[in-house]
Amino acid sequence: MEKVLNLALKQCEEAEVFSYTSEEIPVEFESNRLKNIESSQSTVIALRIIRNGRIGYGAATNLEDAEKLVAMAVETSQFGMKARFELPAPQQYLDVKTYDPAVEKVTIEEMVQLGQELVDAVTGASSEIMCDAGVSRASGSVTIINSKGLNATYHSSLFSMGIGGTLIRGTDMLFVGDGKYSSHPVRSGKEIIENVLRQLDWAKEQAKIASGTVPVIFTPHGVGNALIAPLTSAFSGRMVLEGASPLKDKLGESLFSPSLTITDNATEDYEAASAPFDDEGVAVRSTPLINQGVVENFYYDLHTAALAGTQSTGNGNRSGGGLPSPGINALVIGEGDTSFDEMIADIKEGLIIDQLMGGEQGNILGGDFSGNVLLGYKIENGKIVGRVKNTMIHGNVYQLLKDVAAIGSDGRWVGSSIYAPSIYCHKISVASE
């Protein structure tokens, strides 16, 4: 990496070399049977330069041809955007624990057993269901060096497991599933199994819900499906700068329910998305986006922060080794004190949304979302009475989250980077056949 940096500095004012290496072993089940076990390794080397005030970029999968990588960055700098920022100097990072060596010690046999237990438990509850499952362990490292003297590295581990099932009866298709991610080994699938069996139990009966406006409970999965995309895009520093965010002039204003607090926080030990620094070498931090209903911060990388006249929030994220852009690290929605059962008991007639298909349709930047309810349940007189079919919902995230009835005490990680409780809202528009 130092060779690439030194070669680049002969032709530019500033330079940065980013390296990401990973090794993953996934165990895959398909149609209730073990299908595949494989090991994969990947490396990405990315060079970003500032030459004649413009940004150049090149990427490779190894360091064997440093001259070619530098030439690529120099060539692209002729057409690159103007660099309004400076690369970060060495700085203090929080001691965020991201690596557990125990992950790499989990044997393939143990992983196969965990996956088989998931499949056996779900098919044992429903002999007709077809399941795909996966158990994976991975480790990796990120290194960034730059011309300001920054030289930073961290190692990470990730263990994940999950299952998805499809139950087909005639023209009726039921989809269920759950998963878990951690920087520690996951030794048991009990929680996943319980969640999927609960989905199957609630879906045994079918129930019709009339078109109109009804109260709605979004489960943690439902929150992730329906509400997160409009919110995260609106808080992006890039969208704010482009004038596309409806929140662009709203800092300090109370636009949401006072019960709602949302933070971008990748500083917690051993969480799957945690890290000491972002993909530009800037220290990550806990950034409140919404604090008790008040719009408090936007998130930035170096480039957008410079354009906005502020500091990076440590949200410079790369996709596949590409140029950094503002991105959420780990979105944490604060829990409330209402149980899921208490929410259900409060509703005479309403809807539970667990999985939404096509939730990112509509004017996302305006907060709109709509989609088909892939997995949802009807509530009657404080009880779940069955699964709804052929039902669509549409709403606006700003209106919904301003009129919150309760926030659940049942927070959990949904995927690797969203922590969400259930959210009970007073009304949503429903269209049912």
Where are these regions (language model features)?
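N-terminal small-residue-enriched
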Residues: 1-433
